[in-house]
């Protein structure tokens, strides 16, 4: 019994020591070119890329498998720009707005089907939140929320409930980042 305990203890200690060194060195294994330069998201099978006006889907070998060249079609508010994206539970969440002269209007989180990149619904922006632009977006899987960042005023992150689409709150960032993207 003591011998088994000692072997298990050594194994656990060795695993703990090994775990501390994991991730210490990264090597680029390959590169493949993609269209788009606004945002990228990945699930276990695909990469999703946003251009300013197009959504793309690539397999893990870098082959283009889907493209939506009309991502603003059907949106409840006029838009001309896709920014950052995230993917969760078979849906792509995209920060979308009408962006002109450094100002965003009609901010929304457009939700697309990850299979065929078609628009499903939008989460409306809450103007009283103080947000004036959307530069970054992330799905908070633990809290079932989507968070947006603002390039013009980077002091806050703005959170919306995924279940209801309603604005929940903003979080003050300290120290304040400036001109963050994606």
Give the positions of each predicted feature.
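Structural motif
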Residues: 55-56, 101-110, 154-159
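Short loop/turn segments immediately following the C-termini of beta-strands
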Residues: 52, 97-99, 149-153
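Surface-exposed loop and turn segments in beta-propeller and other repeat-based domains
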Residues: 26-27, 68-78, 119-132, 169-182
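Blade-loop segments of beta-propeller domains
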Residues: 64-99
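Short coil/turn segments that connect the beta-strands within blades of beta-propeller domains
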Residues: 44-45, 89-90, 142-144
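Beta-strand-rich domains and repeat architectures in extracellular enzymes and scaffolds
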Residues: 27-53
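Repeated scaffold domains used in trafficking and secretory/extracellular systems
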Residues: 34-41, 76-84, 129-139, 178-182
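Beta-propeller domains
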Residues: 48-72
């Amino acid at each position: 019994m003591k011998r088994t305990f000692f072997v298990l203890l050594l194994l656990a200690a060795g695993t703990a020591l090994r775990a501390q060194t994991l991730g210490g060195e990264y090597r680029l294994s390959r590169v493949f070119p993609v269209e788009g330069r606004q945002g990228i998201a990945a699930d276990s099978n695909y990469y999703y890329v946003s251009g300013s006006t197009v959504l793309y889907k690539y397999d893990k070998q870098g082959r283009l498998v889907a493209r939506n060249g009309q991502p603003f079609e059907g949106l409840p508010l006029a838009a001309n720009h896709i920014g950052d994206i995230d993917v969760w539970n078979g849906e792509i969440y995209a920060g979308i707005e009408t962006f002109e002269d450094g100002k965003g209007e009609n901010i929304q989180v457009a939700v697309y089907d990850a299979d065929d990149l078609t628009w499903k619904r939008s989460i409306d922006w809450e103007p009283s939140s103080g947000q004036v632009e959307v530069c970054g977006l992330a799905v908070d899987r633990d809290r079932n929320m989507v968070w947006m960042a603002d390039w013009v005023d980077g002091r806050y992150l703005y959170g919306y409930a995924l279940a209801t689409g309603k604005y929940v709150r903003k979080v003050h960032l300290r120290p304040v980042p400036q001109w963050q993207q994606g």
